[in-house]
Amino acid sequence: MKYSNITEAKFIDRPNRFIAHVELDGKTETVHVKNTGRCKELLLTNTAVGLVKSDNPDRKTKYDLVSVYKKGIGWINMDSQAPNQVVMEWLKTRSFDYIKPEYVFGDSRIDFYMEKDQTQYLMEVKGCTLEIDGVGYFPDAPTERGVKHLRELTKAVRQGYKCYIAFVIQMEGIDEVRPNEQTHKEFAEALREAETAGVEVLHLTCGVGIDELRILEGNTL
């Protein structure tokens, strides 16, 4: 996926999880942050960020903050909606007979349901923006929703579904995502239980720029 109307600015601060202040053309601009996670290790004062201009003239904020530059890594996409969009693009190239997003299973909505050759698939997607010493980690904040999804996938695989949890790595040069035990031990435990049950973990490497996120060729199911 590629963004249009991208503009580079400098990050100033983040008063709350929904908005940030940036310096754009010498002026302070309030922008919407398309990620409600903490992202404290990314959003540092004077860091370069990528903004997408909204085409809605009635919005209070004119821009969405979608990417941030990290020294030693490059551009990181931090748009929380982007992982599902690029996975949908990618799944369409995988020869499935049927793909349905937002599939209701049990008490949850799982990101994707697919069918191919009489096999039923479920896939939950998680975006990874946290990097420590060359390794990606998820989550960057406690996620009870993430734990719930893993438990649903564990149930599903025992019912005969082929199940995946796909970590979309929203930065270049990283090819592994590990559970962030320190931040959310319960998620790490649920991930291990899911893997033991037969849920497959995908580490989807990406090409990333200030204005794009795409799953690289070579990633397989």
Predicted stretch roles:
Residues A9, I110-D140, L153:
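Conserved catalytic cores of phosphodiester-cleaving nucleases, focusing on short active-site segments
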Residues D13, K53-D58:
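Short, charged beta-turn/beta-strand-edge "cap" motif at the junction between a beta-strand
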Residues N16-H21:
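Short aromatic-glycine-enriched beta-strand elements
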Residues N56-G72, I215:
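OB-fold/S1-family single-stranded nucleic acid-binding modules
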Residues G134-E144, T154-T183, T205:
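Nucleic-acid nuclease catalytic cores
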Residues Q170-L221:
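Domain-level recognition of nuclease-like catalytic cores that cleave nucleotide substrates
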